[in-house]
């Protein structure tokens, strides 16, 4: 059974109906009056795609890197080549240094940036007063891989993590963005990275100066990694997935949530019982997709080394990654399928989470959030 974290801040999660009631709307901390329009605009019905045609994003570039693994990401490794990240920024009307706005960073899935998904979410949020930065991790690394399988073998979750934290630094440098209120949102493959970014081990590597996201959202992200170091950044996370999504192992997601909670972050799980994978994508479905990663189990050691359960060597390069993924995945595949009714419900759940984060005190104090979890 999915769990309902009854003490997740001030919001109550009802699993099954998947609606979130945010009593955090009554939060009365400093500056709430100045941010009240976020509550009002996010609580209203989301604008339809047809009404968003006049919202154009701005292509932006900023420094990032391309480490294959967390071990490579270390500053002294020499195996983290510089990369110029690619992204599209959607700014709300009226955003300025005098009126900075909160923001989200979006990480795409294995199929790359989709107009129907990332770009539509970004335009909708921008219309409601939230800046959205859509990262194109594949586009920035076309020299490394182009085909679907080739990209998944050579453009790793660690590289997407590098882009995520580079995006956070970029947004914090802009006077029209409230850098203390930036939420990381990931879809499927990007959702894995959005979850891993909540672990302090990853944050310390990519943001040693203390930059942290105010919240994390993982849409239908496979829960296949276990971090030996369970320290969390302290920022909250919600996982959203479908009850008919075969790429999700609910027990593993529960375990991952418990690890993050033990490390200092609050975690909520929202399940839409009738939904397949990618209910907000472009495919009407249900349509079967290739191989399924749900049986895979990765372990991330304290030094950043990643190992699988069926291969004796670490995931240090594309060959070993291919072997580990090939041995652990199955050929039964999984179903994807757009469901507009589920999309409406997940919109409401996402809005409630963003309201809580944006109307709260901002990024948690980094030192207070870092605590050593009890031994396993």
Q: Where would I find each of the regions flagged by the language model?
A:
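Bacterial N-terminal signal peptides
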Residues: 12-24
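N-terminal cap/lid segment of alpha/beta-hydrolase-fold proteins
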Residues: 38-99
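Acidic beta-to-alpha connecting loop that harbors the catalytic carboxylate
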Residues: 66, 243-245, 273-276
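Serine-hydrolase catalytic machinery in alpha/beta-hydrolase-like enzymes
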Residues: 78, 85, 100-173, 329-332
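Primarily recognizes the serine-hydrolase "nucleophile elbow" in alpha/beta-hydrolase
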Residues: 156-234, 246, 251
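Short beta-strand/loop motif that positions the catalytic acidic residue
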Residues: 239-241
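Short alpha-helix in the alpha/beta-hydrolase fold that links the catalytic acid
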Residues: 249-259
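Alpha/beta-hydrolase-fold serine-hydrolase catalytic core, especially in secreted/extracellular enzymes
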Residues: 261-267, 273-376
């Amino acid at each position: 059974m999915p769990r309902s974290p009854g003490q997740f801040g001030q919001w109550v999660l009802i699993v099954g109906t998947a609606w979130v009631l945010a009593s955090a709307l009554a939060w009365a901390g400093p500056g709430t009056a100045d941010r009240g329009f976020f509550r009002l605009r996010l609580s209203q019905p989301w604008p339809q795609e047809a009404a968003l045609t006049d919202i154009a994003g701005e292509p932006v570039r900023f420094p990032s890197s391309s480490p294959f693994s967390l071990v490579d990401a270390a500053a002294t490794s020499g195996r983290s080549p510089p990369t110029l990240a690619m992204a599209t920024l959607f700014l709300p009307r009226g955003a300025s240094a005098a009126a900075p706005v909160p923001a989200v960073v979006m990480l795409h899935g294995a199929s790359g940036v989709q107009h129907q998904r990332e770009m539509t979410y970004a335009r909708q949020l921008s219309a409601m007063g939230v800046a959205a930065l859509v990262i194109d991790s594949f586009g920035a690394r076309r020299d490394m891989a182009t085909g679907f399988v080739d990209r998944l073998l050579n453009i790793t979750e660690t590289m997407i993590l590098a882009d995520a934290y580079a995006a956070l630094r970029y947004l914090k440098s802009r006077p029209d963005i409230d850098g203390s209120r930036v939420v990381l949102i990931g879809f499927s493959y990007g959702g894995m990275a959005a979850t891993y970014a909540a672990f302090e081990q990853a944050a310390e590597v990519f943001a040693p100066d203390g930059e942290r996201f105010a919240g994390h959202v993982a849409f239908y992200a496979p829960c296949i990694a276990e971090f030996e170091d369970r320290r969390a950044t302290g920022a909250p996370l919600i996982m959203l997935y479908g009850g008919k999504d075969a790429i999700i192992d609910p027990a593993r997601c529960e375990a991952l949530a418990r690890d993050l909670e033990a490390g200092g972050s609050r975690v909520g799980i929202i399940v839409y019982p009738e939904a397949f994978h990618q209910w907000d994508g472009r495919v009407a479905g249900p349509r079967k997709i290739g191989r399924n990663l749900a049986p895979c189990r990765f372990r991330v050691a304290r030094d950043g080394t990643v190992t699988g359960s069926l291969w004796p060597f670490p995931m240090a390069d594309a060959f070993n990654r291919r072997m580990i993924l090939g041995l652990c995945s199955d050929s039964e595949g999984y179903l994807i399928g757009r469901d507009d009714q589920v999309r409406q419900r997940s919109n409401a759940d996402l809005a409630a989470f963003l309201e809580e984060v944006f109307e709260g005190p901002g990024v948690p104090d980094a030192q207070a959030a870092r605590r050593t979890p009890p031994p396993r």
